[in-house]
Amino acid sequence: AFIGDSRTDGFMIYSGIGNGKNLTSNGLSIFKLKEKKALTIDGKKYTLLEALALEQYGKVYLSLGVNELGYNNDKGFYEKYRDAIQTIRQLQPNAVIYIQGLIPLNEGVIAQTGGSRYLTNEHLRVYNDLMRKAAQEEGVVFLDLYSEFADGNDELPAEASKDGVHLRGAWCRQWL
């Protein structure tokens, strides 16, 4: 199962992964994970975690953090991530839990397309460090996607995204 925001949704659509439950919501943040009723299943609204509880999975991937960059609440982000990991563990006791680190941004493309100024790799790296720390403390796997996607300028290559945030289809396949 994959829990995340629009970046994870794009991955699920364009990567060709083929299987895996898509539990995503555009604009979702770790701060709203337990509150936002984002999925409709058989006519009933669920939070992503409520939907996760409907089935058992061998692996659960969590990737949230870009939408939170403008919150200026690093401590709250870290605490909510730990809480999310603990909740997922309760809901999926037999699953291996993976925290997917945030893929870098391309700040030049973000500026050209009128994106938000709070979207910076500097703050994104802080969030990755907090996610890594939460994963280590909770005994789950942290996947360093930043290093996999960063170019020689330590950012997402311009050709990888038309808005500097969301990956193009071919780059989603690289995520696999």
Label each residue range with its predicted role.
Residues V66-E68, I103-N106:
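Active-site-proximal loop/turn and secondary-structure-junction residues that shape catalytic pockets
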Residues E35-A38, N67-G76, I88, S116-N121, ...:
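Second-shell loop/turn segments in exported
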Residues L105-L176:
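Catalytic His-Asp segment of secreted/periplasmic serine-dependent ester chemistry enzymes
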Residues Q92-V96:
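A short helix->loop->beta-strand "cap" motif at the edges of active sites that frequently abuts
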Residues Y81-I85, N128:
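Generic structural signal for well-ordered alpha-helices
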Residues S63, Q100-G101:
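Alpha/beta-hydrolase-fold catalytic nucleophile elbow
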Residues L52, I88-Q90:
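N-terminal cationic-hydrophobic initiation segments that often serve targeting/anchoring roles
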Residues A1-K80:
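Conserved SGNH/GDSL esterase-like catalytic core that processes O-acyl groups on lipids
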